Amino acid sequence: MPTIVSNNEVKKVPNIKPLNTGPLNKIQFSNIIFPFGRTFGPKIFGELAQKLSEYSPNNNGIKIPVPGEGLPRVINYCADQSGCAFWRMIWPGDELLANNRAVIMTLYQMVTLGQFYGGIDAVRLQRQCTEPQLEFIKFLRNVSDQMKQQTGKGFRIIWEVDDIVCPAVDIPDYNVCKTAFEGDTVYNNVKEMMKYVDEATVVSEHMRQHYKKHLGFDKITVIPNYAPKSWIDRGYDEKQLRRKYNRKGKPRVLYAGSGTHFDVTNKTGQKDDFGHVVDAIIKDITIDKKYDWVFFGALPMKLKQFIGKGIEFHPWCSILDYPQKLREMDVDVSIAPLQNNAFSRSKANIKLTEAGMQGIPCVAQNIDCYNSDGWKYLFDTAEEMFKKVDQILRTENSYMEACKFAREYSEKFLLQDHLDEYTLLYTTDYGDIKRKENASFLKNNPEQFV
C-alpha cells in the first residue's frame, strides 16, 4: 500500500542502521516512516488521511480514510507454496485484505531489517523448524522487545503448523516427507522456538494436545481450516444431484489426496492409509464390480495396475481449479481412509469440506479428525466403509439427505464467517477475554478461558 508523503518529509527520514547491525539501545524509532504507511512519533494516520483528502478533487471537506487505517497489520512468512500455505496463510490473508479487516503482507524471504517491522501487530511464521529459522525467530523476538522498550509497543510472534513435524517417531514411515524431519535437530529447534514465540496455532484439538505434550508449551490455539467461498463454492444444485443419482451406470466413488498417504517407496510393505481397505477395493474391481473408482491426485501402489481397468485416474491440478475438477468428475460419494496414528488423528477435516461443498458426501475414517464435529458417515473397517457407501446410495432420498448434510456441514467452515478469529489472534493475547466473546473461538479453544 503506497504512503502519500511530500518530498520534504521523505528527506527528513534519518539514515537508521538495521537493528541487527548496530547497538540496539541506540536506535531511535520516532519519526521513521515504516511499511504500510505507518509511523511512530508525530506522523500518524490522521495526518495521512488529511493528505489523501487534499488529493481528492471533490471531497467537499469530507475526510477520506486511508485504506487500512486502524486495522491490524500482520506479516506472514510461508514455508511452502502448496495447499498448506494457502489454507493456513495465503487465503486468510487475502480474505482479510479483501474485506478490509487487516493489512497482511505475505512473504517467503526472511527480512532482517529491524525497521521493516515498525507498526506491525503480529508476525506469523508457518512450519519453521530449521536452525536458520530458529535464529530468525530469535531476531524477531529481539526486534519486538526493543520496539516495546523504545515505543511501548512490540509485535506478537506466532508459530503456525498444520501437521505433526515432531517428534519424528509420530510421522508415519510410509509418508515420503518424513525424511525431512528425522533426527533430533528439528525437534530440538522447535522446542527452542517456543521460548521466543507468543503463541502457536494448529488445525485441531488433537494436534494441540500433541504439541502441548511434546513441546511443553501451553499457549496453543486451534484455528480450523476455513475455505474461501470464492474458491470452494461452485453452487449446490439439487436437480443436478438427482440427475446424477438416476443416471445409468455404476455409482462413482472418489478418493482425492496426495501421495503422502501412500507407501510410494514400499518402506512399510504398503501398510499405509489405504492398507486396511485396498484389498476390498481390488475385490470390487475384479469380482463384485459394484462401483466405478475414481482417484484424483494419487493412488495406492497396489491399484496402479487397474488404471483404465476399473480405476479412472486424474493427475493433480492447480489448486485454483480443484473444486471445479471435483464437480466435473461427476462422482456420487467420496471416501477418506486413514491409518489410525497420531499423525492422522491430528489432521484437519478438509476431506469432508472440499467434497461436501460440492454436495458430495464423504465416508470417512472414524478417528479424531473426522468424528469430533458431528460428521455421521464414519467407518472403522473396509466392510463398514462399503456398508456406509451402500447406505448413502440405497435410495434417492437417502442420497439427497447425505448430500444436503454434507453441504450444510461444510458451510460452517467458510472463511468469510471466521475472519474475527484471525483478527483476535493477531491483536489479543492468549486467553484474552475478547476471544471468549467469539462463539467459534470459544468452541475451538475452551481451555483458554478455564
List the predicted regions and their residue ranges.
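N-terminal pre-catalytic "stem/leader" segment of glycosyltransferase-like enzymes
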Residues: 2, 11-131
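Acceptor-binding helix/loop patch of EC 2.4 sugar-transfer enzymes
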Residues: 15, 158-187, 230, 235, ...
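Conserved catalytic-core segment of nucleotide-activated headgroup transferases in glycan assembly
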Residues: 80-95, 226-328
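Membrane-proximal helix-turn-helix segments that form the acceptor-binding/catalytic region
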Residues: 142, 146, 165, 179-200
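Donor nucleotide-sugar binding/catalytic pocket of nucleotide-sugar-dependent glycosyltransferases
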Residues: 195-212, 216-238
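Nucleotide-sugar-dependent
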Residues: 263-272, 320, 324-357, 364-374
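A charged, aromatic-enriched C-terminal amphipathic alpha-helix characteristic of glycosyltransferases
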Residues: 397-431, 435-437, 441-442
